Structures are given as C-alpha cells and as structure tokens.
C-alpha cells in the first residue's frame, strides 16, 4: 500500500462523515478514459476516480488533524457558476435518497449543491422515489417527509420548482392533493413503459404537470456498490463501515442554447455508529 492509500485509510478510519463531489465531469479530461454505457457504471467510475484523485493529493496537515468530516473532491474539476452568468443558466438536480431513515438528507443535499456551484438557489429539484422494502408499494406516507423538506426549501427560496419520479397517476394525484407546493414535473422511466400511460398524461395535462422521461435504474447507488468502489480505490479499508445517505446529480444548462455547461455528482456517506 502506498503512502497515499495509508493516509486515506487513516483519515477514513477516524472520520464520521464523507462528502464526495466530482466537480464538473466535463473538466475531467484524462480521468475520463472511457464512455460508460450506463448511469450506474458512470457513477461507479466517478466515485472510484474521485477517491483516487483525492487520496493522491492529501495534505499532510489533514492527517495530523483527523477531521470528523472529509471533503473528497477532484480539485481541478471544481467549477462555480459566474454570478454575472447566473440568469443565463438553468441549474437542475435529481436527488436519490439511499438511507431511508433521514429526511433531513434533502436539505443537506440542496445546501451542499448550492455551495458547490456557488449559487443561492436551484431552479429545479426532482426527487427519486425513496427506498422501500421489497414487496411494499410506494405510498404517500413514504414520500411525505421528503416532500415536506422540499416544500420548506421552496418557501425559503433555495429551490424554485420541485418534481417527482416514477409516480403513477394514483400516486401523483394523491401527492398533488396533499401537497402545499405542487409538483411541477414527474419523470417516467421509458424502460418500464414505452408509451406514457393515458391516465397519467390526462392528469398531468389537467394540472399543468410536465411529464419527462429518464433512464435511471431503480437503484442508482446501493450500499454495496458504494462500498465496492471504496474498497477498489483504497485497499484494506473497512469499507463495510461506510453507508451512503444520499446522492445528488446536477446539471447546468445554458438556457439560450440548450447545451450542458456543467454536470456532476455529490454524495454524503457516514460511518456506522457515528
């Protein structure tokens, strides 16, 4: 094991929380040697390479301090939005909750995304369906704690618009009727339905909800896949001790031209028992 791995292993053995951010993937250059075939493959690659890059540049002072929170990033890829250009950009995010016991993850993720990008608010946040036990159908009760956090963030002007993912007509209608801040969009996975369901289309049209498509897997990041990436990047680490809480994928689009200026991932993980 090299010095880099030893330092990273020592820090991760003492830290309680890990914040990992890829920076703008369009700035990765040599780090992006291949074009991943799926979102899961891209994410695994990003986590692994971010950890590798971070561990190769650890400041010796950090090892003496042993901070509770580790900020793991690809420093040369970090890119904040120029305040003078903010009005020309649309900043969108999709939030994936991995650890279902933490509704406060929503606020943590949005706050961190704003900080990373240097903005006061996000234009749009879509929340993926929270994790539920196998054999259990998603209900309004599963969504409510996360949606309430999103509503608070809209009311405090941290987010402009909020949306959902993979809700059928009944689920979307229940959320719409209950929510104070209504969903303005719902993503549909075309892998599971080649044509938009007519009842969902009719309901969305009636209440001015935009129907979007996506091709994310049901579970973009699992505890096992995160631990695998951690183990591959930093050998001999106690990877099973680390649990991802949430993952946020963002994109910054130039409104007038419809081109992506920036995209990346941010995630938070905690060590068990901390």
Curated annotation (Swiss-Prot):
Q: Which organism is it from?
A: Homo sapiens
For this UniProt entry, the molecular function terms from Gene Ontology, in alphabetical order, are:
glutamate-cysteine ligase activity; glutamate-cysteine ligase catalytic subunit binding; glutamate-cysteine ligase regulator activity; protein-containing complex binding
**Disulphide bridges in this chain?**
none
**Which sequence positions carry the modification called N6-acetyllysine?**
263
Q: Which Pfam families match?
A: Aldo_ket_red (PF00248)
**Assembly notes:** Heterodimer of a catalytic heavy chain and a regulatory light chain.
Gene for this protein? GCLM
* Protein name from the UniProt record: Glutamate--cysteine ligase regulatory subunit
Give the matching PANTHER family: GLUTAMATE CYSTEINE LIGASE REGULATORY SUBUNIT, GLUTAMATE--CYSTEINE LIGASE REGULATORY SUBUNIT
